[in-house]
């Protein structure tokens, strides 16, 4: 995985609570098991007026020209609730999002996000509301999420966030479960060398 230390990008304010995984990536688009190709279906039922995805809904926030290059998603509480599909963070990252900021996340979505190098940032309701107000007033203006300093910076606003030290380390170093295992390759090889031939 790519290393994540800091990201500066345009935030898009999705002013909705309890956004579930079926809204993030509807079930009819889950046939693939690879991680790519889901971005075009992100928020399909909200982004499009037709089933084929050829008629954009002009009232949906992601379809507004100023947010076309958004890479940070701002949402309300309980983001990613519903089923445990890992396709949800796949769709978000494939679309181009690097971070999601919300007061709270569904537990499984929260864990899946770290596994897919999508940074879920928890801020208080008050801080999220301040960010919504700032983003609305400064639409299209980039903000910064700094994983090393554990801060979200938007103009004069600067909010600190907490994150599990192990997950933070893995994202900063770009380590998934395979990468973590390979860090111990020497120990693994030494252990294997001690085993009887029939066990190798």
Curated annotation (Swiss-Prot):
Stored InterPro entries: 3-IsopropMal_deHydase_ssu (IPR004431), Aconitase/3IPM_dehydase_swvl (IPR015928), AconitaseA/IPMdHydase_ssu_swvl (IPR000573), IPMI_Swivel (IPR033940), LeuD (IPR050075)
Catalytic reaction(s) noted: (2R,3S)-3-isopropylmalate = (2S)-2-isopropylmalate
UniProt pathway: Amino-acid biosynthesis; L-leucine biosynthesis; L-leucine from 3-methyl-2-oxobutanoate: step 2/4
UniProt keyword annotation of Iron-sulfur present: no
Molecular-function annotations in GO: 3-isopropylmalate dehydratase activity
Record Pfam families: Aconitase_C (PF00694)
Any one biological process term the GO annotation gives: L-leucine biosynthetic process
EC id: 4.2.1.33
Keywords associated with the record: Amino-acid biosynthesis, Branched-chain amino acid biosynthesis, Leucine biosynthesis, Lyase
Any one GO cellular component localisation term in the record: 3-isopropylmalate dehydratase complex
Known partners and oligomeric status: Heterodimer of LeuC and LeuD.
Family label: Belongs to the LeuD family. LeuD type 1 subfamily.
PANTHER family: 3-ISOPROPYLMALATE DEHYDRATASE SMALL SUBUNIT (PTHR43345:SF5), 3-ISOPROPYLMALATE DEHYDRATASE SMALL SUBUNIT 2-RELATED-RELATED (PTHR43345)
HAMAP family reported for this sequence: LeuD_type1
Protein name, entry field: 3-isopropylmalate dehydratase small subunit
Protein species of origin: Proteus mirabilis (strain HI4320)
């Amino acid at each position: 995985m790519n290393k994540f230390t800091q990201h500066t990008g345009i935030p898009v304010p999705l002013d909705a609570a309890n956004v579930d995984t079926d809204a993030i990536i509807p079930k009819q688009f889950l046939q693939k098991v690879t991680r790519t190709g889901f971005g075009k279906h992100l928020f399909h039922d909200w982004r499009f007026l037709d089933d084929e995805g050829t008629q954009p809904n002009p009232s949906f926030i992601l379809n507004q020209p100023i947010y076309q290059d958004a890479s940070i998603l701002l949402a309300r509480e309980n983001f990613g609730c519903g089923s445990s599909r890992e396709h949800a963070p796949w769709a978000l990252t494939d679309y181009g999002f690097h971070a999601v900021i919300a007061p709270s996340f569904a537990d499984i979505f929260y864990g899946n996000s770290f596994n897919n190098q999508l940074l879920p940032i928890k801020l208080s309701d008050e801080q999220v509301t301040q960010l919504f107000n700032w983003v609305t007033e400064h639409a299209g203006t980039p903000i910064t999420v700094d994983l090393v300093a554990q801060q979200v910076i938007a103009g004069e606003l600067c909010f600190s966030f907490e994150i599990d030290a192990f997950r933070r380390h893995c994202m900063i170093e770009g380590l998934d479960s395979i990468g973590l295992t390979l860090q111990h390759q020497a120990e693994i090889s030494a252990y294997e060398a001690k085993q009887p031939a029939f066990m190798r």
